[in-house]
Every structure is written in structure tokens, then in C-alpha cells.
């Protein structure tokens, strides 16, 4: 089964949102103790930090995680979290990851997300995996 992989700081905003989804998820550790590897396709849920300043918007833990070949290979999409106070840099980390790794930015939500965000993300994830599996089947035909 495909999973979500997410990073959440000690504020736990992203963690609380992911828990509301009731979808299997793995958390990128706050402290890089050892290499964290994913061995199946996943969607990354990533918050933006440092007021959306481009150089530091992607948490270093996420950068380290994506520098591992397996983790980079299995990344299929990204969901961004942020604060609308960042203005044009709202969810900028999601945009950065999407462009750098050439995966779709599937959704953006603010802070803890709303109930509507939870429903939209769950439905969007289901549609995304179905579409991805259909494309894969067509390529193998």
C-alpha cells in the first residue's frame, strides 16, 4: 500500500493534520539519527518554514531525506502546508519540492487544515493513486 511521508516540527501542526487523514503515514524524524528510507511510492506532506524565505523554506531534515536515492525515486507527489501570512510564499516548500523533483503539487493547506481540507486531501490522494496505477498499467500493456 502506498503511504504518506511527512515532516512536522515540534509545533505538530502537520502531524495533527496527517493523523486526521487516517491514512498510513511515516514521519521524517526531527533529529537525523540514522538514514530513514522508504521502499514504496509515497506522497510527501511538507510544511514551509522561516517565513517562506526561499533558502530555508524546506526543512533540512526533508532535504537530507530526499538526498537518499530510494527516497527520491519513490516520491510521486507533494502536499504543501503553510501560513497565509507568508503571502506569495504560502506553501513555498511544496512548490520547491514539486519543481526540483518533477512531481505534482497535489494540494495546499494552511496550518492545521480544515475539515474541508481533510476531505479534499483524502479524495485527491485516492484519485491520484488510481490515475497513477492506470498510467502504469497502460505503459505495461
UniProtKB/Swiss-Prot annotation:
GO molecular function: FMN binding
TM regions (residue ranges): none
Any one GO biological process: protein modification process
SUPFAM superfamilies: Flavoproteins
Pfam families attached to this UniProt entry: Flavodoxin_NdrI
InterPro entries linked: Flavoprotein-like_sf, RNR_Ib_NrdI_bac, RNR_NrdI
Family (UniProt): Belongs to the NrdI family.
Family annotation (PANTHER family): PROTEIN NRDI
NCBIfam families xref list: nrdI
HAMAP family per record: NrdI
Function statement: Probably involved in ribonucleotide reductase function.
Name of the featured protein: Protein NrdI
Gene this protein is translated from: nrdI
Amino acid at each position: 500500500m502506498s503511504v504518506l511521508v511527512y515532516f512536522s516540527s515540534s509545533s505538530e501542526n502537520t502531524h495533527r493534520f496527517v493523523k486526521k487523514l487516517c491514512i498510513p503515514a511515516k514521519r521524517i524524524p526531527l533529529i537525523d539519527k540514522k538514514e530513514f528510507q522508504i521502499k514504496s511510492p509515497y506522497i510527501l506532506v511538507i510544511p514551509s518554514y522561516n517565513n517562506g524565505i526561499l533558502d530555508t523554506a524546506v526543512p533540512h531534515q526533508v532535504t537530507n531525506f530526499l538526498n537518499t536515492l530510494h527516497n527520491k525515486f519513490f516520491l510521486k507527489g507533494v502536499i504543501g502546508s503553510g501560513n497565509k501570512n507568508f503571502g506569495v510564499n504560502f506553501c513555498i516548500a511544496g512548490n520547491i519540492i514539486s519543481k526540483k523533483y518533477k512531481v505534482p503539487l497535489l494540494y495546499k493547506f494552511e496550518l492545521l487544515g480544515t475539515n474541508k481540507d481533510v476531505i479534499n486531501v483524502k479524495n485527491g490522494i485516492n484519485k491520484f493513486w488510481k490515475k497513477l496505477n492506470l498510467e502504469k498499467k497502460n505503459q505495461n500493456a
